[in-house]
Amino acid sequence: MSRVCQVSGKRVQTGNNVSHANNKTRRRFLPNLHERRFWVASENRWVKLRVSAHALRTIDKNGIDSVLAELRARGEKV
């Protein structure tokens, strides 16, 4: 399973660890992903999504129904 948020599209980024001596080694910045269930009252069912913390705030702000509508418009199976 890929480390990509289903709502916001956040994914793994790459960069450097930088030591005190300014030595650089490659590293990955992982998104803060959580597998969460959301109750969709209009469909009378639970929907399981893999979302980032940023996407959780978006769902709180806009509502799960509008977020699911955007996902379906993108062609994602929910």
From Swiss-Prot:
Example of a GO MF term: structural constituent of ribosome
Segments of this protein annotated with the region Disordered: 1-23
PANTHER family per record: 39S RIBOSOMAL PROTEIN L28, MITOCHONDRIAL, LARGE RIBOSOMAL SUBUNIT PROTEIN BL28M
Keyword tags: Ribonucleoprotein, Ribosomal protein
N-terminal signal peptide: none
Name of the protein: Large ribosomal subunit protein bL28
Listed InterPro entries: Ribosomal_bL28, Ribosomal_bL28/bL31-like_sf, Ribosomal_bL28_bact-type, Ribosomal_bL28_sf
Upper taxonomic lineage: Bacteria, Pseudomonadati, Pseudomonadota, Gammaproteobacteria, Lysobacterales
Bias kind Polar residues: ranges: 11-22
Family indicated by similarity: Belongs to the bacterial ribosomal protein bL28 family.
Keyword Ribosomal protein attributed: yes
Gene Ontology biological process terms from the UniProt entry: translation
Gene3D superfamilies associated with the record: Ribosomal protein L28/L24 (2.30.170.40)
GO CC terms, sorted: cytosolic large ribosomal subunit
